[in-house]
């Protein structure tokens, strides 16, 4: 709405404008501003709603360059959405913060925030002040989070018995593209995390888990490698394809004759000068190769390249080498093999070599694609998950799915309490909030009831996406939860014949669920407190 704004008058009664270009600015105020925000948030939430749960549908996102991404991951969908409205951008940030902190539940948090705003709209229409709604939501969120603590169960995080961890990872992977082999993927994710986890600090360093993918093969061919995979091959095709008991020199210095640091030029006036230069370079290369071999190294990994002459000399001297290895890979190789990165050639000693039981080059299908696998390393706390798939899109989606699973297992190691999925926790919290609302003597009880209704949107979306009647299914499960006093009863999305999520092993982490409720509530409170928007108008050329 374009607004001229309020005019001020001088002592002679002449009008003047206070704000620059006030006539070209657009402005929304009061309820109109709130309704605009709620409409934008609902539009984003409704887009995400169909992606929720094991039967959630995927979205195809096409970017400006025409690249296609098919995904079910809430954070990815929102980050690729080209949103223009400022509140829709806040929803994108909300999903991102859930992804950064927890890694899973990115779709649910947006759907919940959208439902809370939808309920708030009805309360605003009844004349309740937005601040009272925001305060009621805050009280309700506190009740829901306390109730989650009461209904949570602890799982045993034990390296010997990984079944509870695998079941939790399977719940996360159930809604993804990889659900055809989600048991295998869950086992890979659990083994990867437990290999690198620091159980004393109860933390996981994700830098030690590398996820690589290669087009070809099936998703079932995905495997966990206790070591490092590098997307490179040996520098010369005649070098051996396998090096056993490898002692690795990890070089980040250029593999070439030394050059002066200052600006210089070399005058070559005759053939003899050129031959002398060639001879000097060859001698220097041989000297450098000899220096590497004297330390006991039988494999050189270089961050920089070297020319064909050096490559030929390396082959003659039986020293396999790999060139142009990136910085992160060099660091991971150093961690895995227990070696030290050598920035200057003169500093190379036997103590700085890394050790690996086997380094081999593997080929894929009929293509010329090759990769290096460094296994049986000195330090087994660096692992690589190697994903295969029919096309690039499937591999990228599998990477995102595994990221969610890895995050969930890390959260369980940090805090081993869980709640039950399938909407069971949300229904139980909604019942607890409704009971608490009846005890609230002030106007906030309306907002608390609205909060309970909003929580029920998640189980309703789950049943809707599974092809059931959402309202009928929801009322049946809610009635059973009250009658049987069992907070583990949820929506039977997979049609297994039981609503008990404990029997179905549908498990979610407690910290993830708490974070969902608190983040969505904070976001909605912030939106409800905005009553005025000023936007710059179109600039006149």
Swiss-Prot record:
Ubiquitinated by the DCX(DCAF12) complex specifically recognizes the diglutamate (Glu-Glu) at the C-terminus, leading to its degradation. One of its GO terms (biological process) is positive regulation of telomerase RNA localization to Cajal body. InterPro entries: Chap_CCT_epsi (IPR012718), Chaperone_TCP-1 (IPR017998), Chaperonin_TCP-1_CS (IPR002194), Cpn60/GroEL/TCP-1 (IPR002423), GroEL-like_apical_dom_sf (IPR027409), GROEL-like_equatorial_sf (IPR027413), TCP-1-like_intermed_sf (IPR027410), TCP-1_chaperonin (IPR053374). It is an enzyme of class 3 (hydrolase). It holds the Pfam family Cpn60_TCP1. The modification Phosphoserine is found at residues 26, 346, 539. GO terms for cellular component: cell body; centrosome; chaperonin-containing T-complex; cytosol; extracellular exosome; microtubule. It comes from Homo sapiens. There is a cross-link at residues 20, 210, 214, 265, 275, 279, 392 (Glycyl lysine isopeptide (Lys-Gly) (interchain with G-Cter in SUMO2)). It is found in: Cytoplasm; Cytoplasm, Cytoskeleton, Microtubule organizing center, Centrosome. Induction: Down-regulated in response to enterovirus 71 (EV71) infection (at protein level). This is T-complex protein 1 subunit epsilon. Keywords: Acetylation, ATP-binding, Chaperone, Cytoplasm, Cytoskeleton, Disease variant, Hydrolase, Isopeptide bond, Neuropathy, Nucleotide-binding, Phosphoprotein, Ubl conjugation. Component of the chaperonin-containing T-complex (TRiC), a hexadecamer composed of two identical back-to-back stacked rings enclosing a protein folding chamber. Each ring is made up of eight different subunits: TCP1/CCT1, CCT2, CCT3, CCT4, CCT5, CCT6A/CCT6, CCT7, CCT8. Interacts with PACRG. Interacts with DNAAF4. Interacts with DLEC1. Interacts with SPMAP2.
């Amino acid at each position: 709405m374009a607004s001229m704004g309020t005019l001020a008058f001088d002592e002679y009664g002449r009008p003047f404008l206070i704000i620059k270009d006030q006539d070209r600015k657009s402005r929304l105020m009061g309820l109109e501003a709130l309704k605009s925000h709620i409409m934008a948030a609902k539009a984003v939430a409704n887009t995400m709603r169909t992606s929720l749960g094991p039967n959630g549908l995927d979205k195809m996102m096409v970017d400006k360059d025409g690249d296609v991404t098919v995904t079910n991951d809430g954070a990815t969908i929102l980050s690729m959405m080209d949103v223009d409205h400022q509140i829709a951008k806040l929803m994108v940030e909300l999903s991102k913060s859930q992804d950064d902190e927890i890694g899973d539940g990115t779709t649910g948090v947006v759907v919940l925030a959208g439902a809370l705003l939808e309920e708030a709209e009805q309360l605003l229409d009844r004349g309740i002040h937005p601040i009272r709604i925001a305060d009621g939501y805050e009280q309700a969120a506190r009740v829901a989070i306390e109730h989650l603590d009461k209904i949570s169960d602890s799982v045993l995080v034990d390296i010997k018995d990984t079944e509870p961890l695998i079941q939790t990872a399977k719940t996360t992977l159930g809604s993804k593209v990889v659900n055809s082999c989600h048991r295998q993927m869950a086992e890979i994710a659990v083994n990867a995390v437990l290999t690198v986890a620091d159980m004393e600090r109860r933390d996981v360093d994700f830098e030690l888990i590398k996820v690589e993918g290669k087009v070809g093969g099936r998703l079932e061919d995905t495997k966990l490698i206790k070591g490092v995979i590098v997307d490179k091959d040996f520098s010369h095709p005649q070098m051996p394809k396998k090096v056993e008991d490898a002692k690795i020199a990890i070089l980040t210095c250029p593999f070439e004759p030394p050059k002066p640091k200052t600006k210089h030029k070399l005058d070559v006036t005759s053939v003899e000068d050129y031959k002398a230069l060639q001879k000097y370079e060859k001698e220097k290369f041989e000297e450098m190769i000899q220096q590497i071999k004297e330390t006991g190294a039988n494999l050189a990994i270089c961050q920089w390249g070297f020319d064909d002459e050096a490559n030929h000399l390396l082959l003659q001297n039986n020293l396999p080498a790999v060139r142009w290895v990136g910085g992160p890979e060099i660091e991971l190789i150093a961690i895995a093999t227990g070696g030290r990165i050598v920035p200057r050639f003169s500093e190379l000693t036997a103590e700085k070599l890394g050790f690996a039981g086997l380094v081999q080059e593997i080929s894929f299908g009929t293509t010329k694609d090759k990769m290096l696998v460094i296994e049986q390393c000195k330090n087994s706390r660096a692992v690589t998950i190697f994903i295969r798939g029919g096309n690039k899109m499937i591999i990228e989606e599998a990477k995102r799915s595994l990221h969610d699973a890895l995050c969930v297992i890390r959260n369980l190691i940090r805090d081993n309490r869980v709640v039950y999925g399938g909407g069971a926790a949300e229904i139980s919290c909604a019942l607890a909030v409704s009971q608490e609302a009846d005890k609230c003597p002030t106007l906030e009880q309306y907002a608390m009831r609205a909060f309970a209704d909003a929580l029920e949107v998640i189980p309703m979306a789950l049943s809707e996406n599974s092809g059931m009647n959402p309202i009928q299914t929801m009322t049946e499960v809610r009635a059973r939860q009250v009658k049987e006093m069992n907070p583990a009863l949820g929506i039977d999305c997979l049609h297994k014949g039981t609503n008990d999520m404990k029997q179905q092993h549908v498990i979610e982490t407690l910290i993830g669920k708490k974070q969902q409720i608190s983040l969505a509530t904070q976001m909605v409170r912030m939106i409800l407190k905005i009553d005025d928007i000023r936007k710059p108008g179109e600039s006149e050329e």
